[in-house]
Amino acid sequence: MQTTNGSDSTLATSGATPPNQQTPPPPQQWQQQQQQQQQWMAAMQYPPAAAMMMMQQQQMLMYPHQYVPYNQGPYQQHHPQLHQYGSYQQHQHQQHKAIDRGSGDDVKTLWVGDLLHWMDETYLHSCFSHTGEVSSVKVIRNKLTSQSEGYGFVEFLSRAAAEEVLQNYSGSVMPNSDQPFRINWASFSTGEKRAVENGPDLSVFVGDLSPDVTDVLLHETFSDRYPSVKSAKVVIDSNTGRSKGYGFVRFGDENERSRALTEMNGAYCSNRQMRVGIATPKRAIANQQQHSSQAVILAGGHGSNGSMGYGSQSDGESTNATIFVGGIDPDVIDEDLRQPFSQFGEVVSVKIPVGKGCGFVQFADRKSAEDAIESLNGTVIGKNTVRLSWGRSPNKQWRGDSGQQWNGGYSRGHGYNNGGGYANHHDSNNYHGEN
């Protein structure tokens, strides 16, 4: 009894916890457990195999004595890169160390496209972490939905490491999926200053591309003749994963860009002739407003109140899929206008009013019209450079002349990059345009 009492006394005086009682975990430990549980739950967004791995890792962190490292198991033998998931969070604390970024031309960032919806920064980092050269990873997401836009960027500590990844991984199958890697140089490294933002944009639009044309092939087609070519991008349909039949090439020299506009227009890439035109930069959008009155004159109409005012489209007309095409060559016929636009989606109708120097293209859906405006604005159709903007929707006809439903105005237009880069969802420059 004395021994027992002594033991009880010892427990009481020492503050020890009896065996049948548990001391609540310290706040810091409790928060850590909560965070681990949240990470565990987040793993459920991954495919079963990847989710299982992440949950195993969380269990290892909480109960290390019960688990052996899974890089010794059979799953790791088949998926050697995926064991890097856990090291990513620790690596993020090291990614801001001083890095020798070299000269302005020493780009060390790769664009990675065709990402599936569940492929986040952790996954993307795991694909290349074995190089020991990954500096930072970013997956671009929609600002409204937070869903992945299907592409991201990986910056390496050296250009040599980036080049090796580009050469060895392009076209190979991504871990835990049937999706091949689609990799290209990003236009800017995260360590570079985007001084060119205030300079001229030296990009060209390339249309009528064969379905088999890739970023690499498009880049080679132009860079073989023009050494200043910085990047090339074939726009991919995010739903089908297939080429939309057009892309963009960025130059570093204005003279070479000008030569390419004439020399490469009609040249072959793969088995099809290309159509080359000027790609309209984002900052040109604001300048389009000043031309609205000129476009109204081209449309040749008056508003219902008698003033010059055709086609001022409200931004709320989210279903409008009609495009105003200004500056048309007088010799251009409906079919000449239909052909370049049809590569962006189903064209419902084309109308060129006689003697007006303009035309109207109506798509079956808004998205196709947006893509066409982004890509064809400022390109050459026939002999002239055309200007595109939203026209008046056919279901909103003017009073008096039903034929004037096509007399859309030259209201707010769209640049080709819609967010800081080449094309809608697959551009390297969007890395710096997103938050």
UniProtKB/Swiss-Prot annotation:
Keywords for this protein: mRNA processing, Nucleus, Repeat, RNA-binding
Q: Name one Pfam family in it.
A: RRM_1
GO MF terms here are: mRNA binding; poly(A) binding
Where in or outside the cell it occurs: the entry states: Nucleus; Cytoplasmic granule
Q: Does the keyword Repeat apply?
A: yes
Q: What induces it?
A: Repressed by ozone-induced oxidative stress.
GO CC entries: cytoplasmic stress granule; cytosol; nucleus
Q: Which GO terms describe its biological process?
A: cellular response to heat; mRNA processing; stress granule assembly
- Give the Low complexity compositional bias ranges: 29-41
Q: What sequence ranges are listed for the domain RRM?
A: 108-188, 202-281, 321-393
**Which InterPro entries does this UniProt record tie to the protein?**
Nucleotide-bd_a/b_plait_sf, RBD_domain_sf, RBM42_RBP45_47-like, RRM_dom
Q: What does this protein do?
A: Heterogeneous nuclear ribonucleoprotein (hnRNP)-protein binding the poly(A) tail of mRNA and probably involved in some steps of pre-mRNA maturation.
Quaternary state and partners of this protein? Interacts with the poly(A) tail of mRNA in nucleus.
Q: Which family does it belong to?
A: Belongs to the polyadenylate-binding RBP47 family.
Q: What is this protein called?
A: Polyadenylate-binding protein RBP47B
* Gene name as annotated: RBP47B
